[in-house]
C-alpha cells in the first residue's frame, strides 16, 4: 500500500484542504521522503479523497491545522489517523501552494476562522522533502551522535533547508535523529528530483553519519523514478 495524507485548515466558518502528500518511502514505518502531488493518484480519486476528508473534519468540528492520514491500495483509501498538529513534511505543501501553514494556524487560533476559501488554493508544480537523519543505514539505521564538523547547506532557486545545524553543533543520542529537512520545488516531478539531486550533492555534514547518501540512491532508483513503490519498498529492496 501507499501512505497518503491530506493537509487541512479548519475554522468555525469552513474547512479547506491543501491537497495531498505521498509519504510512502519509509523505514521502520517512519517517513524518509515526502512529495506532493502524489504521482499515484488521478484527479477523480483525488476529488473523492478531498471531499471525504473535508466532510469528516467538518463533521467533528475540528479547528486548526491538521493532517488526515490514509493507507491507499487498489484505488481504495483506509483511514489511519488524524494528526492535530503541524507535520514534519508540511513544507512540501507550502512550496506548491505558496501558503504559510504556520501563519494560517495562528490566524485560526486567534480568530476562530480560516482566512482562505478553497478557490484560493491552487497548487503549482511538484515538491519533494528529504529528512536528513544522523544515523547509519548500513547498520540498521543506528543513531550517529557526535559533533558536526564542516557543514555546508545547499541553497538556490526553489530550495529550502529547515533546521538549525552548524559547525560545532552537538547531536546527542537522547532525541530524534532528524537534524534537518531539505525541500526542493520544481515545475514537475522530474525537475524537483533533479533539483533535489543537485542539493544533496552540495550538502556537506561531516563528523556524523547521515542519510544523505541513502537519499541519493533512493531518488535515482528506477522504482522511485517510475513511482513504482509502496511503504515496504525500501525494506524489501534493502537499499542502503
Q: Can you describe what each PLM-predicted range is?
A:
Residues 1-240:
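ATP-dependent carboxylate activation and anion-phosphoryl transfer catalytic cores
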